[in-house]
């Protein structure tokens, strides 16, 4: 089965072709980072308009790269949520229109299920069951995964997602959007130990997260330094390092608890923050001590992309899941509501 995948949940337009027998044939992506940078964050209306502009050219590019034509495609998978409603509607409308024109099925895919399954596109994919850490700008969740569609939420953030905390902290210190990579880059030049921030909710049982207080601690420290006349680049880097260390250690502690609670030895990390090298190193060290394994997608598939949507959709389409031609998207969509295969 050859599936065309469309991703438009936020500020990346992603298109890919995945074949159930040959694997990933082609993928193309257009990032809107430059478009939104001047505003310090994603502007929903601008995101939607740019998806409209990019979608069809990217589909043509992907078909050409895979040496395929429209009649070769067996089905279309598109992101139906969660995400920005206007942006989601662009992908959904395009998918349903093409499905009608080409007389093939279309299926809306859960954005975070796409992220969760992205490591399965790698040469050494994880095997069920495993614990997944979904960590991005909009989500920070620990999920037990027993199969596709078989998800048990173990814990999630009570306020800011980890990626959101990265972005907001970077913005408060005058760094460019997106803030996560900027914090990581600055942290490489930071001096360890100059600042120490709390590891939120690690002093109590449970698998919930909270990052708003940590963000506030970083802001207060930056303001205190500025008030004292020290707003140097080195101070910014030192705060970035301390902030990143706090987030990474918090996520690592919670992942270790989740593995102990479930008795599992395999951990999947997915979502934009999973590309963070410090986080990967910390989790790999922790899993090494437990004689377990950690899995993640290649860096370009950690952020939003069409490949993960094409793959996730293919798994469901192959067992006959499909929908009518109505267009329905969801800004919020608990993953536990998904059906199992």
Swiss-Prot record:
Cofactor note: Binds 1 Fe(2+) ion per subunit.
Residues the entry annotates as binding Fe cation: 111, 115, 304
EC number: 2.3.1.234
Listed SUPFAM superfamilies: Actin-like ATPase domain
Disulfide bond residue pairs: none
TM region(s), chain numbering: none
Catalytic activity: L-threonylcarbamoyladenylate + adenosine(37) in tRNA = N(6)-L-threonylcarbamoyladenosine(37) in tRNA + AMP + H(+)
InterPro entries: ATPase_NBD, Gcp-like_dom, KAE1/TsaD, TsaD
Any one of the GO BP annotations: tRNA threonylcarbamoyladenosine modification
Subcellular location: Cytoplasm
Keyword Transferase: yes
GO CC annotations on file: cytoplasm
NCBIfam families in the record: gcp_kae1 (TIGR00329), T6A_TsaD_YgjD (TIGR03723)
Similarity comment text for this entry: Belongs to the KAE1 / TsaD family.
HAMAP family to which the protein is assigned, alphabetical: TsaD
Name this polypeptide is given: tRNA N6-adenosine threonylcarbamoyltransferase
Species of provenance: Pseudomonas syringae pv. syringae (strain B728a)
Primary gene name: tsaD
